[in-house]
A protein has these predicted regions:
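Acidic catalytic patch
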Residues: 40, 61-83
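Acidic, PIN/NYN-like endoribonuclease modules and their adjacent C-terminal/linker elements
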Residues: 83, 90, 97, 102, ...
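PIN/NYN-family metal-dependent endoribonuclease catalytic core
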Residues: 5, 15, 20-50
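Short, flexible helix/strand-to-coil boundary loops that buttress conserved ligand/catalytic motifs
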Residues: 14-15, 49, 116, 134
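Residues at secondary-structure transition points
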Residues: 19, 36, 58, 62, ...
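Short secondary-structure boundary segments
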Residues: 7, 39, 107-109
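Residues that mark the start of a beta-strand
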Residues: 1-2
Length: 137
């Protein structure tokens, strides 16, 4: 199984070790699924960790490197423009499409989750994903 994990889920996995988002990343670490990310997602991760959380550059780079090592990195070619309010969210959708993933996992309840799917790819929250694929967690 292949998944794209939105930036907000990556950040949650760093903040709440052992939490739901971290359980998703643990599935990747354990080899139970593949995570597909794009350069945009990694750059956005670095930007948020630097600007919002004010982490030092070394800690930010360490986090980005960790996810980059775990992930398959794709370069989306198709342009998606379905989210008008926050256009950068379209880059997450493009990654999922380019990676031919089975699920897009996000915590974005305002822009991404309401879409429910994109080009046949289900869009789900972390808890929903874990309930479906790891009952009992």
């Amino acid at each position: 199984m292949r998944v794209t994990v939105d930036t907000n889920v990556l950040i949650s996995s760093l903040i709440a070790t052992g939490g739901s988002a971290d359980q998703v990343i643990q599935l990747v670490r354990d080899g139970e699924m593949e995570m597909v990310l794009s350069r945009f997602i990694l750059d956005e991760l670095a930007r948020v960790l630097t600007q919002k959380f004010e982490l030092p550059a070394k800690a930010v780079q360490s986090a980005v490197d960790r996810f980059q090592r775990l992930a398959i990195i794709v370069e989306p070619r198709a342009i998606v423009n379905v989210i008008k309010e926050k256009r950068d969210d379209n880059r997450i959708l493009e990654c999922a499409i380019a990676g031919r993933v089975d699920f897009l996992i996000t915590g974005d309840k305002k822009h991404i989750l309401p879409l429910a799917s994109i080009q046949g790819i289900p869009i789900v929250g972390v808890t929903e994903f874990l309930q479906k694929h790891r009952p009992g967690l």
